[in-house]
């Protein structure tokens, strides 16, 4: 896979064009001042796009990934992409984001591990950032994305769309920069992190840090990584991503194959969760998991803005808000609050799904309708 590096100039304009469709571009945005005042130097953001950029650059749709996603929204696995697109089929000719008309752009979020600057990246001293990587927020992620777009000569977007952490990013974008976006889709998220979410995320972080191979966060390059802690964190997280009824319908209390839980064997659901944990641990950096989990726990669109209600009511942008009926991580009451307080929302769209929080990824036909409606709003 070709990787094109793009470096911001003092004028903020692009020195090279967007990468070829589906290819990764590395955009160097320079130093970024974070919300807590820390200056993160030499920041790089990985970018992919699908569809052609219009001459007036007015057809950009930002697709924002969740916790363990990346810039690879759609397409097969391959070099640089250990898995197929995480929202495969959402962008392309005739797709909800119709690339015959729109230019879909996705980044790997700040703090990520698929080309963007994160804990596994090299700091200016040539050593991995590791434990020295600063705490970041959702607001910082949006600032980095916008800086990457500015480096490519894009200062406004037609729409931002995302679910879960991507939904938090979309919401921050809409509230912080309402003059630079025409519409938004906010899925399966709330206005701020809840106590339950913070508890869930901090427990996952604790599992990773309890692994002796965490090494205080400085395990990169040592030949050892906190894989076991990462797997446990993912097993716990996956339970919050799926619907309770769906899991019971699939597994109930059935033993795994020929194993007997009464003599030390596993239940089928244990095997399933172990598989999910191992799958993520093979492709995702534990340090990034910690940094992004902490960013999610910091999510609060009302911080510094007079609270959630004041922040949401200040946003005039047309917004589609969607929630999943069986979501137990971001229950539908959280999206109801968004729908009631955002002036540009015409009411909550409910996706009836058994798949829990992951419904925003699984129910592509239903979610696709929400994407199409969002882009209709962007054309008004």
UniProtKB/Swiss-Prot annotation:
Pathway: Amino-acid biosynthesis; L-methionine biosynthesis via de novo pathway; O-acetyl-L-homoserine from L-homoserine: step 1/1. The keyword Secreted does not apply. Residues 59-363 form the AB hydrolase-1 domain. The active site is at 164 (nucleophile), 327, 357. Pfam families: Abhydrolase_1. HAMAP family: MetX_acyltransf. This is Homoserine O-acetyltransferase. The gene is metXA.
């Amino acid at each position: 896979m070709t990787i094109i590096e793009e470096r911001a100039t003092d004028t903020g304009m692009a020195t090279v064009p967007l990468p070829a469709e589906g290819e990764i571009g590395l955009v160097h945005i320079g130093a970024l001042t974070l919300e807590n005042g820390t200056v993160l130097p030499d920041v790089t953001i990985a970018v992919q796009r699908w569809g052609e950029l219009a001459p007036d650059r007015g057809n950009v749709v930002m697709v924002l990934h969740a916790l363990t996603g990346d810039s690879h929204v759609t397409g097969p696995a391959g070099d640089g992409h250990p898995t197929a697109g995480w929202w495969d089929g959402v962008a392309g000719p005739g797709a909800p984001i119709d690339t015959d008309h729109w230019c879909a752009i996705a980044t790997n979020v700040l703090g990520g591990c698929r080309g963007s600057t994160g804990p596994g990246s090299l700091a200016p001293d040539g050593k991995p950032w590791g434990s020295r990587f600063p705490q970041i927020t959702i607001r910082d992620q949006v600032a980095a994305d916008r800086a990457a777009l500015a480096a490519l000569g894009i200062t406004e977007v037609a729409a931002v769309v995302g679910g879960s952490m991507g939904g938090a990013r979309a919401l921050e974008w809409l509230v912080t920069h309402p003059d630079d976006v025409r519409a938004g889709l906010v899925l399966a998220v709330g206005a701020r992190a809840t106590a339950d979410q913070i508890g869930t995320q901090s427990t996952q972080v604790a599992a990773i840090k309890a692994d002796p191979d965490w090494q205080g966060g400085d395990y990169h390059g040592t030949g050892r990584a906190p894989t076991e802690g990462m797997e446990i964190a993912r097993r716990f997280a996956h339970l919050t991503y799926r619907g309770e009824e769906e899991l019971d319908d699939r597994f109930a209390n059935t033993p795994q194959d020929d194993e007997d839980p009464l003599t030390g064997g596993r239940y089928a659901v244990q095997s399933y969760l172990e598989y999910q944990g191992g799958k993520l641990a093979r492709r995702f950096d534990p340090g990034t998991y910690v940094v992004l989990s902490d960013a999610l726990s910091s999510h609060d669109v009302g911080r510094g803005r007079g609270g959630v209600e004041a922040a949401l009511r200040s946003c005039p942008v047309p917004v589609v808000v969607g929630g999943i009926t069986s979501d137990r991580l971001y229950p539908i009451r959280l999206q109801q609050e968004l729908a009631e307080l955002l002036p540009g929302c015409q009411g909550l769209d409910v996706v009836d799904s058994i798949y829990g929080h992951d419904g925003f990824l699984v129910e592509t036909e239903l979610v696709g309708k929400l994407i199409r409606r969002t882009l209709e709003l962007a054309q008004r």
